[in-house]
A protein has these predicted regions:
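Short, charged, surface-exposed secondary-structure boundary motifs
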Residues: 17-21, 93-99, 145-148
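ATP-dependent small-molecule kinase phosphotransfer cores
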Residues: 6-63, 67-74, 110-112
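Small-molecule kinase domains that catalyze NTP-dependent phosphoryl transfer to phosphate-bearing small molecules
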Residues: 44, 100-156, 160-161
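Well-ordered beta-strand positions
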Residues: 6, 83, 133-134
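A glycine- and Lys/Arg-enriched "phosphate-lid" helix/loop adjacent to the NTP-binding pocket
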Residues: 27-32, 75-127
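Conserved nucleotide-binding/hydrolysis micro-motifs of P-loop NTPases
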Residues: 13, 89-94, 141-142
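A conserved segment at the C-terminal end of the G1
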Residues: 1-5
Length: 162
């Protein structure tokens, strides 16, 4: 919960599934698992993993982080109004962020980063970005500026909807 909203992270759902399967949460393992889940359960499979969290939320507004495909958006539309915010940054900026973040599954080499990028492009992230209701360029923002900007947009949407 943050600023009065439930925050659900799709990547955390994949990490939880990896844990259930006793897989080490490395980038290659999580990438392979994500593709396997989509192949077996459809392109919206990762969104399906967060449905229980959506259903259990007592809040009217849920922020879902990490959408990668239009099929995931369609799954989420079964549970309410969906507004899409694309946060974009240059390749070098994103690589720097991921390297600094320091999660076990974050790419530490340019090669691993490019593999991750190509995997996400392959599942349709570019199409989801193209459908976004709003975009933020995150090349020169601090983390706090990004959060502030993001929640201003969300609050604007809330005023539109209500």
């Amino acid at each position: 919960k943050f600023k009065g909203y439930d925050i659900i992270n799709m990547g955390n759902a994949v990490r939880a599934e990896a844990k259930n399967r006793n897989l080490e949460p490395t980038g290659p393992n999580l990438g392979k698992l994500m593709l396997e889940l989509r192949e077996k359960n459809g392109q919206g499979a990762i969104a399906e993993l967060v449905v229980p969290q959506i259903k259990n939320s007592k809040l009217n507004v849920i922020v879902i982080d990490g959408i990668r495909s239009n099929a995931e958006i369609e799954v989420l539309r079964n549970y309410g109004t969906v507004k899409l915010l694309a946060i974009h940054a240059s390749t070098s900026t994103r690589f720097g962020f991921l390297k600094q973040r320091g999660r076990l599954d974050d790419p530490q080499t340019k090669e691993n980063f490019e593999e991750r990028d190509n995997r996400e492009i392959g599942i349709g992230i570019s199409n989801s970005i193209a459908l976004s209701d709003e975009t933020i360029s995150n090349n020169n923002l601090t983390k706090n500026e990004l959060i502030e900007h993001t929640f201003k947009i969300i609050e604007g949407w809330m005023n539109e909807i209500s």
